[in-house]
């Protein structure tokens, strides 16, 4: 198990910034690394002075591996971390669940299956349908992999990094469900 934390920060953006520049500098870097809420960094727009600097996301990973004579079984769960809703347990249903079975013995048949992987990804909860600042029970509308300042979301050349079933907002239409 473990905790994975990634952040996009710095650079330029025309959205919610000061003169198009996103916060930079060592003080802001420390605020990014520690995910400090309401930071007191330099050159902060209103959005980040009441939030966190950068586009944070990650996962809490849990796994259990069972080693038997004939196979190794791996069961795992990755819970999504986006805006604090996991801290308040409001998006517990969202995440990736997996089961992997790997056979240890091969019998030399012309065709045999040595590994089997089954995964189920769910993201419909999003922590609920309301986001109210300061209310731990209303930390919804997670909108995974998207961000106010970084409008193309968690992407590289317009392709989402991480989970391919979630598209950045630049690739979607408001008319679609």
Give, region by region, the residue ranges found by the protein language model.
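Aromatic- and glycine-enriched pocket-lining scaffold segments that form the walls
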Residues: 1-49, 53-69, 73-76
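Outer-membrane beta-barrel pore domains
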Residues: 45-177
């Amino acid at each position: 198990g473990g905790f994975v934390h990634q952040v996009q920060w710095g650079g330029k953006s025309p959205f919610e910034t000061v003169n198009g520049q996103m916060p930079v500098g060592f003080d802001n870097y420390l605020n990014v690394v520690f995910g400090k809420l309401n930071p007191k960094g330099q050159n902060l727009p209103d959005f980040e002075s009441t939030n966190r600097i950068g586009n944070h996301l990650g996962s809490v990973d849990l796994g259990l591996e069972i080693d038997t004579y004939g196979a190794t079984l791996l069961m795992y769960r990755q819970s999504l971390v986006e805006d604090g809703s996991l801290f308040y347990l409001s998006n517990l249903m969202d995440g990736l669940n997996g089961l992997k079975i790997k056979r240890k013995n091969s019998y030399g048949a012309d065709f045999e299956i040595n590994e089997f992987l089954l995964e189920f990804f769910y993201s419909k909860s999003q922590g609920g349908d309301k986001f109210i600042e300061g209310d731990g029970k209303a930390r919804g509308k997670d909108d995974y992999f998207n961000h106010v300042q970084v409008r193309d979301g968690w992407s590289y050349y317009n392709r989402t990094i991480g989970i391919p079933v979630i598209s950045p907002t630049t690739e979607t239409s408001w008319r679609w469900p």
